[in-house]
């Protein structure tokens, strides 16, 4: 058994990523951000689903800024550059990638 809360820290300096599961078909991980913490620009090379478990985040891609709250679910567009910023003091989301 894995406990996410015991394996992450909320930092405004950098994203904290904790791998939950990896197989030849799935990569599943949790990302923790403190207030104003940033998951720097990157792309999702495969279909990916984001689920916010705690806090609020800004999800910025191209010229669009989205705001997600606890329990929001979002299908991340494949190949589109995006960046995520924490709004609350503690922000936690998971990403499931179909490999």
Give the ranges of each region predicted by the language model.
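Ligand-binding loop in jelly-roll beta-barrel domains
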Residues: 78-99
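Short, conserved beta-strand element in jelly-roll/cupin
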Residues: 32-34, 45-58
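Short, charged/polar surface micro-motifs in flexible loops or helix N-caps
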Residues: 25-26, 35-36, 56, 99
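Short, surface-exposed secondary-structure edge patches
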Residues: 30, 49, 64-67
């Amino acid at each position: 058994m894995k406990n996410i809360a015991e394996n992450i820290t909320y930092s405004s300096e950098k994203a904290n990523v904790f791998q939950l599961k990896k197989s030849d078909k799935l990569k599943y991980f949790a990302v923790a951000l403190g207030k104003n913490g940033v998951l720097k620009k990157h792309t999702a090379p495969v279909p990916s689903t984001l689920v916010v478990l705690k806090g609020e985040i800004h999800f910025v891609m191209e010229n669009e800024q989205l705001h997600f709250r606890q329990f929001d679910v979002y299908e991340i567009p494949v190949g589109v550059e995006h960046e995520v910023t924490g709004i609350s003091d503690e922000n936690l989301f998971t990403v499931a990638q179909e490999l």
